[in-house]
């Protein structure tokens, strides 16, 4: 007997306030990355000028490539932080997915209705009254 395909998806829907808090945190990180980026660009320009006036040097070439690599890394991190901000109006992915085989399997095996009764006080009172009416009819 094969096991059913089980897929558990847990996704949290963010409220507007939670999204704005996350966005503020991300913008603070991105602002610091911008400061680091500008400092590295300035250092890269200093190395360029020194490299131009003093001539070829292996150590300056290494520093130049290292600074260029840091510039690329910092810019990638900035884009990553900005793209990681949750959007409250976005529809969660699990609502777009089709039902898995496991859900079809469970539907075919279940004898219970798919919709459950509401737990409101009015409906509970109606159920209680009908049960009491049935017990009175059965006893008489």
Swiss-Prot record:
Disordered: annotated span: 89-140
Bias-annotated ranges (Basic and acidic residues): 89-104
Membrane topology: Multi-pass membrane protein
Keywords: Membrane, Transmembrane, Transmembrane helix
Biased composition (Polar residues): 105-121
Places the protein is found: Membrane
A single GO cellular-component term on record: membrane
Highest rank taxon of the organism: Eukaryota
Keyword Transmembrane: yes
Transmembrane segments: 33-53, 59-79
Protein name: Putative uncharacterized membrane protein C622.04
